[in-house]
């Protein structure tokens, strides 16, 4: 799950178009990591929506992950409430090139 402490996925921050990594914290929110320095200046003026970027091939691009409010530039407020999950479906597949 994205909220898992060991989870990291490539994301894109819109409307500014910067790529970053969303990291789970083990809590009800995530954090932005590995983002360009210009990010801090751009987020001061607007709220940011976090989407999957599609890099790495694990998730399709454009899946909404959460929102970042300008008063806390590193915290992702997930759109999903992971505490409400009762069941999780696990799908196993091979990445291209893996056997």
Model-derived segments and their meaning:
Residues 1-99:
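A secondary-structure micro-motif
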């Amino acid at each position: 799950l994205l909220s898992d402490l060991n989870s990291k996925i490539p994301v894109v921050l819109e409307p500014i178009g910067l790529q970053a990594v969303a990291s789970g914290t083990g809590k009800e929110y995530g954090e932005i990591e590995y983002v360009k320095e210009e990010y801090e200046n751009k987020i001061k003026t607007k709220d940011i929506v976090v989407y999957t970027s599609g890099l790495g091939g694990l998730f399709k691009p454009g899946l909404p992950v959460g929102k970042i409010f300008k008063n806390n530039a590193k915290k992702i407020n997930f759109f999903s409430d992971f505490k409400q999950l009762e069941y999780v479906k696990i799908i196993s597949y091979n990445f291209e090139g893996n056997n």
